[in-house]
Amino acid sequence: LPGGSITQTLADGTVVTVNLTDESANISPSMGSTPLHRNVWVNGKAAVTLDGAGAKGATITPGYILACQVDFGAKGDAGASSKMTIDDESGNLVSGPLAGKSNGAITLGPGQAKNVTVLDLEKKDAYGGESHTGGNKFTGKTGSVTWADSTLGVSGCAGYAQARSYVKVAVSTDNVSSNVTLWGQPFSIG
């Protein structure tokens, strides 16, 4: 897949550049072993560069939109699991397996789509409970997220199935809060 790049200047002059590189998708047989199941392994790297006096960091949220042409009326399943590496401006590298799954009675009918984030980062909330986020926050002027062999799956899809990657970057400065979204090229998952 070709990946992509977008540069956007915010209202306060902060320049946000988002790059999606090393993007690939490998369609693989589903464990369901029927024409109604789709499975694909995806890889990619999202890198963000901020330029401007007010730029102090951002949150990178990579994910995929999954869609099905015809619904068979069965329950659906969409999920992602991966290994990721986070690199921030201070040179810190964090690597390890991540797992995220969004299960349930979803139905992907004509014209419907499901959002699946690649990351599922867990931390304690302000009250000591469990909190999950699909975005990786970094401080400084640069940050990146890399994912490898993340599995995306759809069940109950009787027609053409398609996916499209995205990288959403949330930037907050002293004067502005904004989101910049880079969309990847749509691809078939069977």
Question: Predicted segment positions?
Answer:
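One face of beta-strands
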Residues: 46, 62-64, 80-82, 102-104, ...
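Exposed low-complexity, polar/acidic, P/S/T/G-rich flexible segments that act as propeptides
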Residues: 49-102, 177-190
